[in-house]
Swiss-Prot record:
It comes from the Bacteria. Signal peptide: none annotated. The lineage of its organism: Bacteria, Bacillati, Mycoplasmatota, Mycoplasmoidales, Mycoplasmoidaceae. SUPFAM superfamilies: MPN010-like. This is UPF0134 protein MPN_283. InterPro entries: DUF16. It comes from Mycoplasma pneumoniae (strain ATCC 29342 / M129 / Subtype 1). Belongs to the UPF0134 family. Gene3D superfamilies: 6.10.250.40.
Length: 115
């Protein structure tokens, strides 16, 4: 796995393997690197530093607003599902009461038939 290095380390490595160590022939390697100094980078499994893309406050604000809207939609959907589940639970409890009453009625009818 390749590791990122700081710009300072990258420049030091290039200085260390500068022009006096470069043989002038461009050797291409399988990973797309060219030249001797890139061999050093590959040898130590280092990656050149990547340029960081900075965002403006406005872009960040837009991203934040979009994320908040998405989260609000998800929250509203979950609240609606919770209400549905609560209503179904109440219906189930009513059905259980009805079934228990019917069970008692059947029991009493069975006792009447036996006697």
């Amino acid at each position: 796995m390749k590791e990122k290095i700081s710009k300072k380390e990258y420049n030091a490595l290039i200085r260390k393997t500068g022009e006096k160590h470069f043989d002038g022939e461009k050797e291409e390697y399988g990973d797309g690197t060219v030249g001797l100094w890139t061999y050093e980078l590959r040898k130590y499994k280092l990656k050149p530093p990547v340029k960081v893309k900075y965002v403006t406050q406005e872009e960040f604000g837009e991203f934040k607003d979009a994320t908040n809207q998405r989260l609000t939609k998800i929250e509203n959907a979950l609240v609606a599902q919770g209400e549905q589940i609560r209503a179904q639970g109440e219906q189930l409890s009513q059905l259980i009461k009805v079934v228990l009453l019917q069970g008692e009625q059947i029991k009493s009818q069975g006792e009447q038939i036996k006697s």
